[in-house]
Amino acid sequence: MARIIALDGAQGEGGGQILRSALSLSMITGQPFEMSGIRAGRAKPGLLRQHLTAVRAATEICGAQVNGDELGSQQLRFTPGPIRGGEYRFAIGSAGSCMLVLQTVLPALWFADGSSRVEVHGGTHNQAAPSADFICRVWEPLLARMGISQRTTLIKHGFYPAGGGAAATVVEPATSLRGLTLISRGETLRTTAEALLAAVPYHVGEREVATLEAHFPQAEKNVVALEGGCGPGNALSLMIQSEQLTELFVAFGVKGTSAEAVANQVAHEARRYLASPAAVGEHLADQLILPLALAGEGAFTVARASAHLLTNIAVVERFLPVTFNLEEARGMVQVMVSKKDSGS
């Protein structure tokens, strides 16, 4: 029987990413794991609905044996079986992030025995999670360059706290994974400001994009009033398309926060990204660790190595025979991954 990997959910930033990465890697490598202290670093520790949905989705896709899969649980034991392609549908039952559930199971389906379609119902535009737009416009184009055939479609927008959204991804097994090198982003080609409004007055979006335009006069502007009963909700994004990649910065309107304050938050994040010579933003850096590790090669630059990034690297190195090296130079950090020496 494979050795059980023991993981401390309180390590590093102590959030749900440790669990999601462990589930992905366990399915792919066939190595079981035990985790204690799940989300110990959070105000409400243990499994929330979104995390529980990710566990149950992983369980269904690989026929795993699992203990501890209940709301509030801080311990989990997961013993995977073979990954099975097919049609899957999961409902979070709250506004928890569809994207984080998808990102847990999709890497395993890159290695499935056939094509798959995964549909998840819940939140599509959440704070502290990649939005559906980020997945479609930023992450998946980079995966395609690595040889991964995956396409996500936003079925319906879902905002916190109501949820009610849905997204579906069609994924084909990858024949092989290529590394990716993102050292410089190159020249900025296009900038687009977009406000999404669901049961929120149109003038809110107009004020948001007008404020962003003051920071980025060259930005194209787009205000989208969503229909179909989703909401209330408001998301403002700034998409920066460069020669080597696309980045997306998002902030969410909340009661008591002005449209101008939301726009200034997006502008601050985007300006901080553009002020650094690094190619990759802080959140995208987190999303690249797992695919690059599975490819066994690659490199990118990021302005700083966040606790989230370092925690994710530590988990990946427990499951895969790879080594990450981080080097600081010229006001940024270069992250490199390589396969471990077979003799080491």
Curated annotation (Swiss-Prot):
Keywords: ATP-binding, Cytoplasm, Ligase, Nucleotide-binding
Enzyme class, UniProt record, top EC level: ligase
Primary residence: cytoplasm
A GO molecular function held by the record: ATP binding
Keyword Ligase belongs to the record: yes
Signal peptide range: none
InterPro entries from the UniProt entry: RNA3'-term_phos_cycl_insert, RNA3'_phos_cyclase_dom, RNA3'_phos_cyclase_dom_sf, RNA3'_term_phos_cyc, RNA3'_term_phos_cyc_type_1, RNA3'P_cycl/enolpyr_Trfase_a/b, RPTC_insert
Entry binding sites for ATP: Q103, H283, L284, A285, D286, Q287
Gene3D superfamilies, per the entry: RNA 3'-terminal phosphate cyclase domain, RNA 3'-terminal phosphate cyclase, insert domain
Pfam families tied to this protein: RTC (PF01137), RTC_insert (PF05189)
Gene assigned in the entry: rtcA
NCBIfam families noted in UniProt: PRK04204.1-2, PRK04204.1-3, RNA_3prim_cycl
GO process terms (BP): RNA processing
Record's protein name: RNA 3'-terminal phosphate cyclase
Function: Catalyzes the conversion of 3'-phosphate to a 2',3'-cyclic phosphodiester at the end of RNA. The mechanism of action of the enzyme occurs in 3 steps: (A) adenylation of the enzyme by ATP; (B) transfer of adenylate to an RNA-N3'P to produce RNA-N3'PP5'A; (C) and attack of the adjacent 2'-hydroxyl on the 3'-phosphorus in the diester linkage to produce the cyclic end product. The biological role of this enzyme is unknown but it is likely to function in some aspects of cellular RNA processing.
The keyword NADP is assigned to this record: no
Cellular compartments annotated: Cytoplasm
Gene Ontology cellular-component terms listed: cytoplasm
